Amino acid sequence: MTRPTHGGNLAWAAALAGCSPSLILDFSASINPLGPPKSAIAAIESQLQNLNAYPDPDYYQLRASLCQLHPTLTPDWILPGNGSAELLTWACRELSELEKTYLVTPAFSDYKRALKAFEATIGEYPLELQVRGYLPTFQPSSLKIDTETRRHGDAETERFSSSVVNANSWMPNVHLSPLGLLLNNPHNPTGQLFDQEVILPLLEQFALVVVDEAFMDFLPPDQQQSLIPRVQDYPNLVIVRSLTKFYSLPGLRLGYCVAHPDRLRRWQQWRDPWPVNILAAAAATAVVKDTDFQQQTWRWLASARSQLFQGLASLPGLHPFPSAANFLLVQSEQPSSQLQKKLLEHSQILIRDCLSFPELGDRYFRVAVRTETDNQRLLDGLNLIL
């Protein structure tokens, strides 16, 4: 089997471990281990009798339900999709129409794949690896375009400045050619969280800014740095959200986009009808109202992430990064592909190598935060092979 570029490939892992896929403990996909919520299962069961009917092509009830998460919005500002991946495809189609689109790297591999599918010109802005005390961290630099290089007209040597993030460190240059920016927040795979004040000024500099907030739900509301409350102020802002990670529904494929209604109407003309099946729509409508599950998740994550971080930091040759999300990036003194293979063979545990991130390579791996019992099993498995 070909080595997967995504997490969650249990068939590949089981073949390597020599066991059934059901026996694999999966730390490679960053999915909430507390779900799916009972509300989702009940909603799906209630719709089984309606499988002989097409979904509402406008998904009005689903959009209205999503507005409960974002009360400042009306349904025409929201577009459900077949996972956030489908919606990112249409975002990349728009970005490809610009002169160049920048990715904050290391970046989720699907961003570059989707941009290349539409023959986009891609630039990269790397996060800088720094060590503070004994903790490694990625320090974002100011997302400011080097305008001096542009005056020389050399697109190949155009770069971003490397000053430390400062939202007031630049002024927009209206003479710049149309540029796009695609990033995620919290950042995957580092788990770093960008403040709103870092991203908002970029909306004056870039023609289109797409922010993938797939993991933002894992932060309690008072800690989130979502730009959804500001989307009505910026017609060039697109926010993409996932419902499958927080609610543990990756098999249903469900996400949504928040953007100007004119943009969303254009996207609807590009895509196939009925991208969200009737069971997924019912589950989504139910889970966004499930405040008990949301509170349970926020209570679980803080303690479980701390347990896993401290446990990894205590193991020889491993250096975890602080994270705001439900996963941890770990720097390893041993090749991560070897650790991955040994963990599967000895403990039937799957971790996510970072070979699909060229900036990271074989000295990093990523692990999801799971229950404290599962986390301890991972720590014991790593201790056995290190």
Predicted regions and their residues:
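N-terminal small-domain helix-loop-helix segment of the aminotransferase-like
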Residues: M1-A85, W90
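PLP-dependent aminotransferase class I/II
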Residues: P37, D58, N236-S314, H319-F321
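Short, conserved charged micro-motifs
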Residues: K38, P335-K342, D374-R377
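Conserved PLP-anchoring active-site segment centered on the Schiff-base-forming lysine
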Residues: E94-L115, T121
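PLP-dependent enzyme catalytic core of the Aspartate aminotransferase-like
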Residues: E345-H346, S356-L386
